[in-house]
Regions:
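Bacterial N-terminal signal peptides that target proteins for export
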Residues: 1-9
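Bacterial N-terminal signal peptides
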Residues: 9-16
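N-terminal signal peptide c-region/cleavage motif recognized by signal peptidases
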Residues: 18-20
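Primary mode marks residue(s) on the alpha4-beta5-alpha5 output face of response regulator receiver
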Residues: 24-189
């Protein structure tokens, strides 16, 4: 076999292997993205990510149920949300691409909600989260409770993110009295 034929054969074989590895990698990415969900929601969940520079949504797998998930981010978090709140996440991604973060991003999102540009989170809607560090809460359910207070619902507000808890904390409320009020429920067994 000539050197050119060997080179071409090696190139095409390498390309084929790379495309198979890429497809397998995408399958693994999607499987990990839906892993925070209960088993019966995984197969039909949409999986997407955002272009960090533009905030544009990129669909990795179109689903047919009421939940959508993002692949694990650089910090080790994997999130799944109700589709109802898609516009909210899309706006957040666009604002983040413009350089907003932290409290400034939350303030901008609140202003958009107050102006009617995005709907408030539905009371009782659930967000599923997974985190890849064993000394923290790996699986967490976040129950949205806009404008609720800890006092009216009888909920604790003490954070359960202490590493000494080894990821086995108890539920607690965050951002009470705001439109972003929510209950954090650890699911780590």
């Amino acid at each position: 076999m000539s050197r050119i034929n060997l080179t071409l054969t090696a190139f095409f074989a390498g390309s084929l292997l790379a495309s198979q590895a890429s497809a397998q990698s995408m399958e693994e990415t999607i499987a990990k993205a839906v892993s925070p969900l209960p088993e019966d929601l995984r197969a039909e969940a949409t999986v997407y990510r955002y272009n960090e520079d533009t905030g544009e949504r990129i669909t990795l797998r179109a689903g047919s149920n009421h939940v959508e998930c993002t692949p694990t981010d650089d910090e080790g978090f994997t999130w799944c949300y109700p589709i109802r709140d898609r516009e909210r996440r899309d706006l957040s991604a666009k604002l983040a691409a413009e350089g907003l973060e932290g409290e400034a991003l939350q303030t901008a999102m609140q202003a958009a909600e107050d102006a009617g540009a995005i709907e408030p989170m539905a009371f009782g809607s659930i967000i599923y989260r997974r985190f890849d560090t064993p000394d923290r809460i790996q699986y967490l359910w976040v129950i949205m409770m806009p404008d609720a207070t800890a006092e009216e619902l009888g909920m604790p507000t003490g954070r359960q993110r202490d590493n000494a808890l080894a990821g086995k904390g108890t539920p607690w409320m965050m951002r009470p009295g705001t439109s972003g009020a929510h209950l954090m429920i650890p699911i780590n067994g």
